[in-house]
């Protein structure tokens, strides 16, 4: 056999390679669609999907904890610091203000005792923060908007209010 002699064409091997390639591409597309559905199908770049998932998860966890009326644990989620009681004075939004905003007997709480919630909208802003809107106690009027900082993983009240398409 010389260098110019071509190997005999193997149709079965060629078909196996083609099926393997199509299988890999099909699996990748299915995995991509599954990830898109898992994070709430945002119309945003795929590399921001983790922000959607983690921000919605943090807001959900915060509101569930407030529903249980466990405000110290909810404040730990709010500030993303489980040991916040060791350095209470280092946070710009104090625990007392947080308890006034989310406490069931507070006059500053616009929603009363929080007994149920539903996350209805989530969008990223230009700076990369995520705004999550939640309906509290089945209200149909004004949702609670929380901003999630993807770098510090802290929640705050959002200065931006989103429109809700329902």
What residue ranges belong to the model's regions?
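Short, flexible coil/linker elements and helix-boundary hinge sites characteristic
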Residues: 39-41, 102-103, 138, 153
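Short beta-strand edge/turn micro-motifs at domain boundaries
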Residues: 8-23, 135-166
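Short, low-complexity N-terminal intrinsically disordered segments enriched in polar/charged residues
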Residues: 5-68
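Hydrophobic, Leu/Ile/Phe/Ala-enriched alpha-helical segments that form helix-helix packing faces
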Residues: 66, 102-106, 155
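Short solvent-exposed beta->alpha transition segments
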Residues: 57, 61, 72-137
């Amino acid at each position: 056999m010389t260098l110019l002699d071509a190997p005999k064409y193997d149709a079965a091997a060629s078909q196996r390679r083609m099926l393997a390639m199509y299988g890999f591409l099909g699996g990748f597309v299915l995995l991509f669609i599954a990830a898109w559905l898992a994070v709430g199908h945002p119309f945003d770049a795929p590399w921001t999907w983790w922000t959607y998932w983690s921000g919605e998860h943090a807001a959900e966890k915060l509101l569930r904890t407030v529903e249980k009326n466990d405000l110290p644990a909810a404040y730990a989620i709010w500030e993303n610091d489980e040991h916040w009681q060791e350095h209470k004075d280092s946070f710009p939004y104090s625990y007392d203000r947080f308890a006034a905003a989310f406490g069931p007997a507070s006059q500053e709480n616009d929603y009363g005792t929080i007994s149920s919630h539903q996350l209805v909208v989530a969008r990223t802003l230009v700076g990369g923060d995520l705004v999550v809107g939640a309906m509290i106690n089945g209200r149909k009027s004004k949702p609670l908007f929380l901003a999630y900082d993807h770098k510090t993983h802290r929640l705050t009240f959002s200065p931006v209010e989103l429109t809700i398409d329902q």
